[in-house]
Amino acid sequence: MEYICFRRFKDNAICGKVNIPKGSLLYIDNGYLIYNGDVICANSSQNCYEYFSRNDDGNGIVRGELTQKIIKALAKRDNNYQKRWDKIWSDMSLLKFKRDEFDDYWLWNHEFYNADIKDLEYIYNKIK
């Protein structure tokens, strides 16, 4: 499976310090993202979720940017903060994107970060 860097990654990776430009392609080997032969991170790591996205459909940059827009919108502490979260919690179709470990706290699961664009657009349009 192919991944793409949707936001420049200049940080420590498993292989050491790296500087991966936006738009760079990576591939998966045994659950790890590989760039120029170097192991970068696990495909289920926070670094992967914040900088890299599944790109097998050619929409990796859009997917990555949408996940980050959703997270940012939900984190915004304004008068509509709770209303946005209530919309997420009340939509049973979104439970497939919630981690199961917590009954009273919403954490996005691996499926959210790999979701189809139409699902991510649905979530974003619901809360924007």
State the predicted function of each range:
Residues 3-11:
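A short beta-strand micro-motif
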Residues 15-120:
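Acidic, low-complexity, intrinsically disordered interaction modules
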Residues 1, 125-128:
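Short intrinsically disordered terminal tails
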